[in-house]
């Protein structure tokens, strides 16, 4: 007999989420996740993927992944610390370090795993972490797992960060203090004030950690937010994903050799999870090589991002203060944002609504993610649909 308590808990809470318009229905994409997708037989302009550079469907990467399956199999077969470390993993990590301008790098199974692994391996109950109030959920969970004292500072507020860093240092309570931030904030598209953060870190001897999941492949000519500001020798820990702009799956942390040596023996997701698959490893390596060889895809991404932003702004939509191709249309009311997303879907645009608690209450939005793979015709069609629905709903 199964638990009646569990059944009651699930029924009550799922019903509550649905009543408040906060239950997320998951759509199934039929086929590849490209600039256009098909859901339940309906063709849609896709403005919701993280496939920034269109590499998830890149033909060269697909072919090299197939060859890796033939030569190395479909899986690594073990955790990295037993005999799951393949030559392909070492080659990938060397390429990541070269890409990020660091001594070494370590690859994980996902970006979320990176933050769970690296933060808790370096910080403990005798330490403190200064964390931006809008940091990603994986950072929040990684900080909690470390058992360090979590001190939130107001989003990108350098005065608040400096004051809280000063108080933490002067308290004498902590062995180590880390400051951690997203490089690019995924809900609003703004970029962290890394030069000022680094200055504060140097003033108070803080460990610097940048989660560049949405910056790698996008900012710094593709090399990320740390490179964008020329701070490769000033940031202790650079985290990034092999999904999003790279188009595959996995994540990494890059930094000094001593840091990577420590993570290999103390980060639990590395120690207790089977390694990244051979196909994913070689496809990720090739994607990074492509970014290092040419800025063409990166330039196309920014061109399309600027084009969509300008089109939506001219219509009168509130697109916030985004500094990257991420383009929110901030509606405000949560239910209205969800209705707007639904109407866009009906007219041929897939742009998911983002509501509380993912964003602050009263800032419900539809988040647009243009990619290098979109054509101008696709973006023009999307803008026209935005205009039609926006006027119908009296949003513009």
Swiss-Prot record:
Keyword Cell cycle: no
Protein name, UniProt field: Putative pyridoxal phosphate-dependent acyltransferase
Residues binding pyridoxal 5'-phosphate, per UniProt: 111-112, 186, 211-214, 241-244
Cited InterPro entries: Aminotrans_II_pyridoxalP_BS, Aminotransferase_I/II_large, AON_synthase_class-II, AONS_Archaea/Firmicutes, PyrdxlP-dep_Trfase, PyrdxlP-dep_Trfase_major, PyrdxlP-dep_Trfase_small
TM spans (from-to): none
EC number: 2.3.1.-
GO BP field: biosynthetic process
Top-level EC class as recorded in UniProt: transferase
N6-(pyridoxal phosphate)lysine PTM positions: 244
Cofactor needs: pyridoxal 5'-phosphate
Annotated family: Belongs to the class-II pyridoxal-phosphate-dependent aminotransferase family.
Keywords, comma-separated and alphabetical: Pyridoxal phosphate, Transferase
GO MF annotations in UniProt: pyridoxal phosphate binding; transferase activity
One Pfam family this sequence matches: Aminotran_1_2
Amino-acid positions noted as binding substrate in the UniProt annotation, renumbered to this chain: 136, 358
Taxonomy, superkingdom: Bacteria
Assembly behavior: Homodimer.
